[in-house]
């Protein structure tokens, strides 16, 4: 079985060079709406307009007094909601928020008043202010035990760490989630995607072997990762000179016509010295574009950096017929505008977008949700632009 022998396969390095450009760029894996930042910023602006500066200052002074551990005053839900949507990018406000959260969490342990879930909202505040270090510190603070125990909180924190290049910290957060033994799925799809993205960006032997172990664990548990997780793992395998693993991994996706999958497959084949097998893939997109899954027509493109790798692989073969056929295919791709200047790395790291649909199910699994109520709401699904992400 492939999964059981995967870690051994990871050690079979076939080539000494990297084949993908692993560019570090400050971008998130979720669009703002997908993690609820749009709603957070809406209410933030609403509060900013609702209160005058003197009123805000008076509120801060009162809350600073109430948050004192020696004070008998309580921090109520509305108090904390207001400061979380009011806090600015300064030490005074951030310290006040921290003090209020700790007191609120302590006074409510064992008995929750109301049904407002603060963890995701607080993480959105830190995301908005771009404070990954503070967010991580509070996440690990024993005084905040139970405060961030929500799937949404983990995903927002990990995405914040991702855009700031803190990939090791993402793996640390995931290990912490495992140790807490929370009542959530063993392999949450969104969390696993961020973990495999971090391993891809780290691009080290250790992180790749860790990714291999996680992949094997998921396969043995019967878990089906989302396509974005699969492509991160496959690209990581290519960068770690294991294109044979990349080819095996992407076969788990039923529809092989997605842009990222085709590009990765071509790179892997070239890296294995099987450029003759890559030519039919390049040639296949020259036919008339067909709608995918009943949706709109999707132009089947190849990345410029992938095409350059194909050219380099062809030169190593020194085969005249191969060169002529490749030139013919590439000329047609150019004429049809089917070679994109977008890099494969950019495709891999493109944002997951939100698609809304009416639903009345529980909101706990929704990244953008803040309340735990039974009233109808628009459930958010996370998809790549125009195509379904879940397999």
Give the location of each predicted region:
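A basic, Ser/Thr-enriched alpha-helical scaffold prevalent
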Residues: 1-391
């Amino acid at each position: 079985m492939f999964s059981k022998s995967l870690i051994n396969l990871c050690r079979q390095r076939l080539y000494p060079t990297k084949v993908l450009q692993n560019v570090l760029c400050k971008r998130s894996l979720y669009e703002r709406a997908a993690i609820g930042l749009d709603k957070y910023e809406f209410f933030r602006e609403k509060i900013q307009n609702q209160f005058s500066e003197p009123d805000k200052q008076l509120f801060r002074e009162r809350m600073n007094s109430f948050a004192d551990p020696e004070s008998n005053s309580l921090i109520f839900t509305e108090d904390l909601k207001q400061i979380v949507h009011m806090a600015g990018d300064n030490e005074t406000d951030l310290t006040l928020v921290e003090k209020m959260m700790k007191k609120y969490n302590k006074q409510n342990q064992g008995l929750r008043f109301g049904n407002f879930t603060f963890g995701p909202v607080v993480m959105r505040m830190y995301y908005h202010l771009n404070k990954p270090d503070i967010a991580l510190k509070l996440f690990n603070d024993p005084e905040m035990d139970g405060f961030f125990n929500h799937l949404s909180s983990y995903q927002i924190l990990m995405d914040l760490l991702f855009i700031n290049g803190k990939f090791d910290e993402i793996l640390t957060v995931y290990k912490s989630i495992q140790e807490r033994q929370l009542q959530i799925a063993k392999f949450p799809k969104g969390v696993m995607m961020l973990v495999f993205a971090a391993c891809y960006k780290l691009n080290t032997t250790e992180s790749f072997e860790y990714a291999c172990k996680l992949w094997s664990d998921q396969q043995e548990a019967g878990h089906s990762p989302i396509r974005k997780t699969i492509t991160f793992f496959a690209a990581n395998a290519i960068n770690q000179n294991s294109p044979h693993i990349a080819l095996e991994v992407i076969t788990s996706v039923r529809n092989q016509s997605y842009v990222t999958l085709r590009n990765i497959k071509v790179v892997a084949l070239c890296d294995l010295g099987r450029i003759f097998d890559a030519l039919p893939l390049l040639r296949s997109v020259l036919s008339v574009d067909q709608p995918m899954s009943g949706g709109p027509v999707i132009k089947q493109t190849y990345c410029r950096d992938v095409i350059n790798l194909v050219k380099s692989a062809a030169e190593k073969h020194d085969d005249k017929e191969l060169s002529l056929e490749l030139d013919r295919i590439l000329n047609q791709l150019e004429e049809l505008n089917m070679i994109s200047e977008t890099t494969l790395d950019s495709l891999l790291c493109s944002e997951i977008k939100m698609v809304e649909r009416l639903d009345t199910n529980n909101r706990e699994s929704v990244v953008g949700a803040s309340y735990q109520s039974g009233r109808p709401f628009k459930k958010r699904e996370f998809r790549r632009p125009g195509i379904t992400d879940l397999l």
